[in-house]
Amino acid sequence: MAKSSQRKQRDCVNQCKSKPGLSTSIPLRMSSYTFKRPVTRITPHPGNEVRYHQWEESLEKPQQVCWQRRLQGLQAYSSAGELSSTLDLANTLQKLVPSYTGGSLLEDLASGLEHSCPMPHLACSSDAVEIIPAEGVGISQLLCKQFLVTEEDIRKQEGKVKTVRERLAIALIADGLANEAEKVRDQEGRPEKR
């Protein structure tokens, strides 16, 4: 009887103890510093002031190395909501910067991008002049050699897919037969109970 009352007391004490993650004390940053540093809690209510150390005020915000990668795959729309094509790019840039007197606006923009984010140079071709007729050849990011897919390439790929599917079908049939044979062996090894 005494043991059960001691257990009840112990259980009550354990329930009354607070959980380690729900502490109301100021949390301490556990790091390689000799002294533990207090952590500023940021709560999502308005009017909360976030305190900074003096050395934190002089820190610069991190910058993205290649910001234009975020823009890949995005479509440009006009103010009317119509999809803009790549052929309108040169005209749009000329409208935005009508007083520009340099050689080629797109070349200067692309060279600025290349200096801000070094990317591997792609194979250039004169076919890209057809994409942007108003601009010259020399923009490495916009003048990529086109990859043409021929009917022969499609037929070769279809043949490869067909042979792989046939091999997969044969493998599935063989696996099913092996499973059935294993079941038969298991049933022969154990006599049936009646």
Swiss-Prot record:
KW Methyltransferase (keyword) present: no
InterPro entries in the cross-refs: MBD2/MBD3_p55-bd (IPR032343), MeCpG-bd_2/3_C_dom (IPR025884)
Chief location: nucleus
Gene Ontology annotations for the cellular component aspect, listed alphabetically: nucleus
Molecular function in Gene Ontology: methyl-CpG binding
Gene Ontology biological-process entries: DNA methylation-dependent constitutive heterochromatin formation; negative regulation of transcription by RNA polymerase II
Stretches for region Transcription repressor: 1-104
Tissue/organ expression: Highly expressed in testis. Detected at low levels in pancreas. Not detected in the other tissues tested.
Subcellular locations according to the entry: Nucleus
Cystine bridges: none
Keywords: Nucleus, Repressor, Transcription, Transcription regulation
Miscellaneous note of the record: Does not bind methylated DNA. The MBD3L proteins are encoded by strongly repeated regions of the 19p13 chromosome. The exact number of functional copies is unclear, and some of them may represent pseudogenes.
Domain-level remarks: The N-terminal half of the protein mediates transcription repression.
Family: Belongs to the MBD3L family.
Function as written in the Swiss-Prot or TrEMBL entry: Transcriptional repressor.
Protein name from the UniProt record: Methyl-CpG-binding domain protein 3-like 1
Species of origin: Homo sapiens (Human)
Gene field: MBD3L1
